[in-house]
Amino acid sequence: MAESLMDIKRKIASTKKTGQITQAMQMVSGAKLSQIEKRAKKYQIYSDKVRQIVTHLAAGQLLELANAAESDTDSGDKSQVISVASLLQKRPVKKTGYLVITSDRGLVGSYNSTVLKAMMQMIKDDHESPDDYVMMAIGGVGADFFKARGLNLAYEYRGVSDIPTFNEVREIVKTAVTMFDNGVFDELYVCYNHHVNTLTSAFRAEKMLPISDLDVSEVADTNVEYLIEPDLDSVLESILPQYAESLIFGAIMDAKTAEHAASTTAMRSATDNANDLISHLSTQYNRARQAAITTEITEIVGGAAALE
Protein backbone atom coordinates (compact mmCIF):
# COMPACT_ATOMS: atom_id res chain seq x y z
CA MET A 1 0.00 0.00 0.00
CA ALA A 2 2.88 2.39 0.82
CA GLU A 3 4.36 1.80 -2.63
CA SER A 4 0.99 2.50 -4.24
CA LEU A 5 0.73 5.79 -2.34
CA MET A 6 4.19 6.81 -3.54
CA ASP A 7 3.26 5.99 -7.14
CA ILE A 8 0.16 8.16 -6.94
CA LYS A 9 2.16 10.96 -5.34
CA ARG A 10 4.73 10.81 -8.16
CA LYS A 11 1.94 10.96 -10.76
CA ILE A 12 0.46 14.03 -9.07
CA ALA A 13 3.85 15.78 -9.01
CA SER A 14 4.50 14.91 -12.66
CA THR A 15 1.05 16.10 -13.76
CA LYS A 16 1.48 19.37 -11.85
CA LYS A 17 4.74 20.05 -13.71
CA THR A 18 3.06 19.29 -17.04
CA GLY A 19 0.17 21.59 -16.13
CA GLN A 20 2.59 24.40 -15.30
CA ILE A 21 4.28 23.99 -18.69
CA THR A 22 1.01 23.98 -20.66
CA GLN A 23 -0.25 26.98 -18.69
CA ALA A 24 2.93 28.90 -19.52
CA MET A 25 2.58 27.94 -23.19
CA GLN A 26 -1.04 29.06 -23.11
CA MET A 27 -0.02 32.47 -21.77
CA VAL A 28 2.71 32.84 -24.41
CA SER A 29 0.35 31.88 -27.24
CA GLY A 30 -2.30 34.23 -25.87
CA ALA A 31 0.16 37.13 -25.84
CA LYS A 32 1.23 36.37 -29.43
CA LEU A 33 -2.42 36.11 -30.48
CA SER A 34 -3.23 39.50 -29.01
CA GLN A 35 -0.22 41.07 -30.71
CA ILE A 36 -0.85 39.61 -34.16
CA GLU A 37 -4.58 40.45 -34.03
CA LYS A 38 -3.71 44.12 -33.52
CA ARG A 39 -1.24 44.05 -36.40
CA ALA A 40 -3.68 42.23 -38.65
CA LYS A 41 -6.33 44.92 -38.12
CA LYS A 42 -3.86 47.67 -38.95
CA TYR A 43 -2.60 45.75 -41.97
CA GLN A 44 -6.14 45.33 -43.31
CA ILE A 45 -6.45 49.12 -43.59
CA TYR A 46 -3.22 49.24 -45.62
CA SER A 47 -4.26 46.29 -47.79
CA ASP A 48 -7.62 47.85 -48.65
CA LYS A 49 -5.94 51.10 -49.66
CA VAL A 50 -3.36 49.33 -51.84
CA ARG A 51 -6.14 47.38 -53.53
CA GLN A 52 -8.03 50.62 -54.23
CA ILE A 53 -4.97 52.27 -55.79
CA VAL A 54 -4.11 49.20 -57.87
CA THR A 55 -7.70 48.94 -59.10
CA HIS A 56 -7.65 52.56 -60.27
CA LEU A 57 -4.26 52.24 -61.95
CA ALA A 58 -4.95 48.89 -63.58
CA ALA A 59 -8.51 49.69 -64.71
CA GLY A 60 -7.38 50.47 -68.25
CA GLN A 61 -5.25 47.33 -68.43
CA LEU A 62 -8.14 45.20 -67.16
CA LEU A 63 -10.50 46.59 -69.79
CA GLU A 64 -7.94 46.01 -72.55
CA LEU A 65 -7.37 42.45 -71.35
CA ALA A 66 -11.12 41.82 -71.29
CA ASN A 67 -11.50 43.17 -74.82
CA ALA A 68 -8.48 41.18 -75.99
CA ALA A 69 -9.96 38.00 -74.53
CA GLU A 70 -13.17 38.56 -76.52
CA SER A 71 -11.27 39.25 -79.73
CA ASP A 72 -9.66 36.62 -81.92
CA THR A 73 -7.17 39.03 -83.43
CA ASP A 74 -3.55 39.22 -82.25
CA SER A 75 -2.64 42.87 -82.29
CA GLY A 76 0.55 44.55 -81.14
CA ASP A 77 -1.37 46.34 -78.41
CA LYS A 78 -2.49 43.01 -76.94
CA SER A 79 1.05 41.72 -76.57
CA GLN A 80 2.04 45.00 -74.97
CA VAL A 81 -0.72 44.70 -72.39
CA ILE A 82 0.33 41.17 -71.48
CA SER A 83 3.99 42.10 -71.11
CA VAL A 84 3.23 45.12 -68.93
CA ALA A 85 0.64 43.46 -66.68
CA SER A 86 1.40 39.76 -66.90
CA LEU A 87 0.08 39.20 -63.39
CA LEU A 88 -3.38 40.17 -64.65
CA GLN A 89 -3.31 37.92 -67.71
CA LYS A 90 -5.49 34.83 -67.58
CA ARG A 91 -4.34 31.87 -69.66
CA PRO A 92 -5.45 28.29 -70.26
CA VAL A 93 -4.88 26.31 -67.07
CA LYS A 94 -2.70 23.28 -67.69
CA LYS A 95 -1.31 23.10 -64.17
CA THR A 96 -2.49 24.56 -60.85
CA GLY A 97 -0.20 25.68 -58.05
CA TYR A 98 -1.16 25.41 -54.38
CA LEU A 99 0.64 27.44 -51.72
CA VAL A 100 -0.32 25.67 -48.47
CA ILE A 101 0.30 27.35 -45.11
CA THR A 102 0.80 25.19 -42.01
CA SER A 103 2.81 25.48 -38.81
CA ASP A 104 6.40 24.34 -38.28
CA ARG A 105 5.52 22.31 -35.20
CA GLY A 106 2.64 20.66 -33.40
CA LEU A 107 0.79 21.54 -30.19
CA VAL A 108 -1.80 23.48 -32.21
CA GLY A 109 -4.77 21.15 -31.92
CA SER A 110 -6.46 20.33 -35.23
CA TYR A 111 -4.99 23.38 -37.01
CA ASN A 112 -2.70 21.46 -39.38
CA SER A 113 -4.92 18.43 -39.89
CA THR A 114 -7.83 20.65 -40.96
CA VAL A 115 -5.77 22.30 -43.71
CA LEU A 116 -4.11 19.13 -44.95
CA LYS A 117 -7.30 17.07 -44.95
CA ALA A 118 -9.12 19.78 -46.91
CA MET A 119 -6.20 20.04 -49.35
CA MET A 120 -6.16 16.32 -50.08
CA GLN A 121 -9.92 16.37 -50.68
CA MET A 122 -9.55 19.41 -52.94
CA ILE A 123 -6.87 17.67 -55.01
CA LYS A 124 -8.98 14.51 -55.23
CA ASP A 125 -12.02 16.46 -56.44
CA ASP A 126 -10.29 18.79 -58.92
CA HIS A 127 -7.46 16.75 -60.45
CA GLU A 128 -7.24 13.40 -62.17
CA SER A 129 -3.45 13.26 -62.52
CA PRO A 130 -0.51 14.34 -60.31
CA ASP A 131 0.79 16.19 -63.38
CA ASP A 132 -2.12 18.64 -63.09
CA TYR A 133 -0.87 20.38 -59.95
CA VAL A 134 2.23 21.41 -58.03
CA MET A 135 2.60 22.09 -54.31
CA MET A 136 4.33 24.92 -52.44
CA ALA A 137 4.51 24.67 -48.65
CA ILE A 138 4.98 27.29 -45.96
CA GLY A 139 5.61 25.41 -42.72
CA GLY A 140 7.44 22.20 -41.92
CA VAL A 141 4.34 20.15 -41.11
CA GLY A 142 2.88 20.67 -44.57
CA ALA A 143 6.20 20.13 -46.35
CA ASP A 144 6.83 16.84 -44.54
CA PHE A 145 3.24 15.74 -45.16
CA PHE A 146 3.47 16.25 -48.93
CA LYS A 147 6.90 14.62 -49.15
CA ALA A 148 5.70 11.55 -47.24
CA ARG A 149 2.88 11.11 -49.77
CA GLY A 150 5.06 11.61 -52.82
CA LEU A 151 3.35 14.79 -54.02
CA ASN A 152 5.16 17.20 -56.33
CA LEU A 153 6.59 19.70 -53.85
CA ALA A 154 8.28 22.44 -55.87
CA TYR A 155 9.04 24.83 -53.01
CA GLU A 156 9.08 24.87 -49.22
CA TYR A 157 9.71 27.59 -46.66
CA ARG A 158 10.26 26.84 -42.99
CA GLY A 159 10.68 29.07 -39.98
CA VAL A 160 8.18 31.87 -40.60
CA SER A 161 8.23 34.15 -37.56
CA ASP A 162 5.39 34.07 -35.06
CA ILE A 163 4.78 37.68 -36.08
CA PRO A 164 5.59 37.60 -39.85
CA THR A 165 7.42 40.44 -41.60
CA PHE A 166 7.36 41.66 -45.19
CA ASN A 167 11.00 40.68 -45.63
CA GLU A 168 10.09 37.01 -45.10
CA VAL A 169 7.17 37.19 -47.51
CA ARG A 170 9.13 38.87 -50.31
CA GLU A 171 11.19 35.73 -50.89
CA ILE A 172 8.04 33.60 -51.05
CA VAL A 173 6.24 36.01 -53.40
CA LYS A 174 9.27 36.40 -55.65
CA THR A 175 9.50 32.62 -56.02
CA ALA A 176 5.76 32.27 -56.68
CA VAL A 177 5.68 35.05 -59.30
CA THR A 178 8.79 33.68 -61.03
CA MET A 179 7.27 30.19 -61.20
CA PHE A 180 4.06 31.69 -62.59
CA ASP A 181 5.93 33.70 -65.23
CA ASN A 182 8.00 30.64 -66.19
CA GLY A 183 4.88 28.54 -66.70
CA VAL A 184 5.49 26.14 -63.81
CA PHE A 185 1.80 26.67 -63.09
CA ASP A 186 -0.92 28.77 -64.71
CA GLU A 187 -2.80 29.76 -61.57
CA LEU A 188 -1.97 29.86 -57.87
CA TYR A 189 -4.22 29.25 -54.89
CA VAL A 190 -3.18 30.09 -51.34
CA CYS A 191 -4.70 27.57 -48.92
CA TYR A 192 -4.79 28.16 -45.18
CA ASN A 193 -6.92 28.33 -42.03
CA HIS A 194 -8.82 31.61 -41.83
CA HIS A 195 -9.10 33.06 -38.31
CA VAL A 196 -12.74 33.56 -37.32
CA ASN A 197 -12.36 33.88 -33.56
CA THR A 198 -10.34 32.35 -30.72
CA LEU A 199 -12.30 29.10 -30.85
CA THR A 200 -13.04 28.87 -34.58
CA SER A 201 -11.10 28.79 -37.84
CA ALA A 202 -12.18 27.80 -41.33
CA PHE A 203 -10.28 26.41 -44.32
CA ARG A 204 -9.93 28.91 -47.14
CA ALA A 205 -8.50 28.60 -50.67
CA GLU A 206 -8.00 31.96 -52.41
CA LYS A 207 -6.85 32.51 -55.98
CA MET A 208 -3.83 34.83 -55.92
CA LEU A 209 -2.34 34.51 -59.42
CA PRO A 210 -3.30 35.75 -61.88
CA ILE A 211 -4.66 38.67 -59.86
CA SER A 212 -8.41 38.40 -60.27
CA ASP A 213 -9.98 40.28 -57.36
CA LEU A 214 -9.80 43.73 -58.99
CA ASP A 215 -13.28 44.96 -59.95
CA VAL A 216 -13.30 47.68 -62.63
CA SER A 217 -16.89 48.56 -61.72
CA GLU A 218 -15.60 49.98 -58.45
CA VAL A 219 -13.96 52.86 -60.32
CA ALA A 220 -16.40 53.16 -63.21
CA ASP A 221 -18.29 56.06 -61.63
CA THR A 222 -15.29 57.92 -60.25
CA ASN A 223 -13.49 60.76 -61.95
CA VAL A 224 -10.15 60.34 -60.21
CA GLU A 225 -7.22 61.10 -62.47
CA TYR A 226 -3.69 60.15 -61.44
CA LEU A 227 -0.58 62.01 -62.55
CA ILE A 228 1.91 59.19 -63.04
CA GLU A 229 5.67 59.37 -63.41
CA PRO A 230 7.52 58.09 -65.28
CA ASP A 231 4.62 56.22 -66.99
CA LEU A 232 1.75 53.85 -66.21
CA ASP A 233 3.50 50.72 -67.48
CA SER A 234 6.52 51.27 -65.25
CA VAL A 235 4.34 51.94 -62.22
CA LEU A 236 2.23 48.83 -62.84
CA GLU A 237 5.33 46.68 -63.27
CA SER A 238 6.43 47.86 -59.84
CA ILE A 239 3.15 47.95 -57.94
CA LEU A 240 1.53 44.70 -59.14
CA PRO A 241 4.19 42.45 -57.55
CA GLN A 242 3.83 44.53 -54.37
CA TYR A 243 0.08 43.96 -54.48
CA ALA A 244 0.61 40.21 -54.91
CA GLU A 245 2.99 40.42 -51.97
CA SER A 246 0.34 42.15 -49.86
CA LEU A 247 -2.23 39.45 -50.72
CA ILE A 248 0.04 36.58 -49.72
CA PHE A 249 1.31 38.45 -46.66
CA GLY A 250 -2.30 38.99 -45.58
CA ALA A 251 -3.01 35.26 -45.95
CA ILE A 252 0.08 34.39 -43.88
CA MET A 253 -0.94 36.88 -41.18
CA ASP A 254 -4.43 35.38 -41.12
CA ALA A 255 -3.04 31.84 -40.94
CA LYS A 256 -0.61 32.75 -38.15
CA THR A 257 -3.45 34.35 -36.20
CA ALA A 258 -5.45 31.13 -36.52
CA GLU A 259 -2.37 29.13 -35.49
CA HIS A 260 -1.85 31.14 -32.29
CA ALA A 261 -5.57 30.89 -31.50
CA ALA A 262 -5.45 27.11 -32.00
CA SER A 263 -2.33 26.85 -29.82
CA THR A 264 -3.95 28.93 -27.08
CA THR A 265 -7.06 26.75 -27.14
CA ALA A 266 -5.06 23.51 -27.19
CA MET A 267 -2.86 24.55 -24.26
CA ARG A 268 -5.88 25.75 -22.28
CA SER A 269 -7.53 22.38 -22.85
CA ALA A 270 -4.33 20.57 -21.83
CA THR A 271 -4.08 22.66 -18.65
CA ASP A 272 -7.72 21.94 -17.78
CA ASN A 273 -7.17 18.23 -18.37
CA ALA A 274 -4.09 18.30 -16.13
CA ASN A 275 -6.07 19.97 -13.36
CA ASP A 276 -8.85 17.40 -13.71
CA LEU A 277 -6.33 14.57 -13.55
CA ILE A 278 -4.67 16.08 -10.47
CA SER A 279 -8.06 16.30 -8.79
CA HIS A 280 -8.81 12.67 -9.64
CA LEU A 281 -5.37 11.48 -8.46
CA SER A 282 -5.67 13.49 -5.24
CA THR A 283 -8.99 11.82 -4.47
CA GLN A 284 -7.46 8.44 -5.27
CA TYR A 285 -4.46 9.23 -3.03
CA ASN A 286 -6.65 10.32 -0.12
CA ARG A 287 -8.78 7.19 -0.38
CA ALA A 288 -5.72 4.94 -0.49
CA ARG A 289 -4.18 6.78 2.46
CA GLN A 290 -7.42 6.51 4.42
CA ALA A 291 -7.59 2.78 3.68
CA ALA A 292 -3.98 2.37 4.83
CA ILE A 293 -4.66 4.23 8.10
CA THR A 294 -7.82 2.21 8.69
CA THR A 295 -5.87 -1.00 8.15
CA GLU A 296 -3.16 0.08 10.59
CA ILE A 297 -5.74 1.04 13.25
CA THR A 298 -7.50 -2.30 12.79
CA GLU A 299 -4.19 -4.14 13.20
CA ILE A 300 -3.34 -2.15 16.35
CA VAL A 301 -6.77 -2.75 17.88
CA GLY A 302 -6.56 -6.43 16.98
CA GLY A 303 -3.10 -6.72 18.54
CA ALA A 304 -4.23 -4.97 21.72
CA ALA A 305 -7.22 -7.27 22.01
CA ALA A 306 -4.96 -10.30 21.66
CA LEU A 307 -2.81 -9.13 24.58
CA GLU A 308 -5.77 -8.91 26.96
UniProtKB/Swiss-Prot annotation:
GO molecular function, one term: ATP binding
GO cellular component, one term: plasma membrane
Subcellular location: Cell membrane
Keyword annotations of the record: ATP synthesis, Cell membrane, CF(1), Hydrogen ion transport, Ion transport, Membrane, Transport
PANTHER family: ATP SYNTHASE GAMMA CHAIN (PTHR11693), ATP SYNTHASE SUBUNIT GAMMA, MITOCHONDRIAL (PTHR11693:SF22)
Family: Belongs to the ATPase gamma chain family.
Quaternary structure note: F-type ATPases have 2 components, CF(1) - the catalytic core - and CF(0) - the membrane proton channel. CF(1) has five subunits: alpha(3), beta(3), gamma(1), delta(1), epsilon(1). CF(0) has three main subunits: a, b and c.
Name this protein carries in UniProt: ATP synthase gamma chain
Organism: Lacticaseibacillus paracasei (strain ATCC 334 / BCRC 17002 / CCUG 31169 / CIP 107868 / KCTC 3260 / NRRL B-441) (Lactobacillus paracasei)
High-level lineage: Bacteria, Bacillati, Bacillota, Bacilli, Lactobacillales
